Regions:
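Pre-NBD coupling/linker segments of ABC/ABC-like ATPases
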Residues: 40-52
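Conserved E/DxxT/N motif and adjacent residues on the DHp alpha2 helix
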Residues: 33, 40, 154
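Cytosolic ends of transmembrane helices, especially the final helix of ABC transmembrane type-1 domains
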Residues: 6-34
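Flexible, glycine-biased helix-capping/connector loops in cytosolic signal-transduction modules
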Residues: 37-40, 196
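ABC-type nucleotide-binding domain
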Residues: 51-246
Length: 246
């Protein structure tokens, strides 16, 4: 009788979690199915040309619609050319395709018709990883990681830049003065490292910083790469007037 009572009680407790178990099983199935899928554009592929770019971007009669909404065409025969060293601004209402153009230059998607050329090369013939290594992007919502400011600026590079290069990029992004005033919070310091606010941790998703400060650190992260192509997707939206002019 005791065993029956204990078993019934245990089953009663367990049954309360049954809906959550079913939700977890369903969610797990979706995740594992997604992991099994192969990307149409493989960033780790060894295929494609590895050209050293100069920074020219050309769109030739580009037509594009997102895979989720193939019937809605976002770009309808878009053509333009941006020469190396030129600044090209895309202006238009929300949803007109400005961010789509940025995504196509990064080759997050392939065009439906037409061509995207980097220099004179069709972007589809280039090695994705090699091409993207020469492009830097700053989005409207900057992404920072729970590490130091210095690590956030250097994040993603195969070879870590020197401290001088990091500070030079921060100066160009108009964030160096703010960083220099921060305290060094390291618990251990080597003899050859001076106190510097670049070692200050920014918190999860940069919660210790304002929107403008996060944006400028993201801009510094892009500049330290010395990219051939710099993409700014409303990157100055959170900046004050002075920083935006710089």
């Amino acid at each position: 009788m005791y065993a029956i009572t204990i078993s019934s009680t245990t089953i009663g407790f367990a049954s309360a979690y049954f809906p959550e178990y079913m939700k977890a099983t369903f969610a797990g199935g979706i995740i594992f199915n997604m992991l099994k899928q192969r990307s149409k554009i493989d960033n780790l592929s060894s295929e494609g040309k590895r050209e050293k770019l100069t920074g020219a971007v050309t769109f030739k009669n580009v037509r594009f619609s997102y895979p989720e909404r193939p019937q809605i065409e976002i770009l309808k025969g878009l053509s333009f050319t941006a020469k190396p060293g030129e600044t090209l601004a895309l202006v238009g209402p929300s949803g007109c395709g400005k961010s789509t153009v940025v995504s196509l230059i990064e080759r997050f998607y392939d065009v439906k018709a037409g061509q995207v050329l980097l220099d004179s090369h069709d972007i589809r013939t280039l090695n994705p990883y090699h091409a993207r290594s020469q492009i830097a992007i700053v989005s409207q919502e900057p992404i920072l990681f729970d590490c130091s400011i210095s690590d956030n600026i250097a994040y993603g590079l195969e070879e870590r830049p020197s401290q001088q290069e990091i500070e030079a990029a921060a100066q160009k992004a108009n964030i160096h003065s703010f960083i220099a005033e921060l305290p060094d919070v390291r618990h251990q310091k080597s003899a050859d490292q001076a106190l510097t606010g670049y070692n200050t941790f920014v918190g999860d998703k940069g919660t210790q910083l304002s929107g403008g400060q996060k944006q400028r650190i993201a801009i510094a992260r892009a500049l330290v790469r010395s990219p051939k192509i710099l993409l700014l997707d409303e990157a100055t939206s959170a900046l004050d007037t002075e920083s935006e002019k710089v």
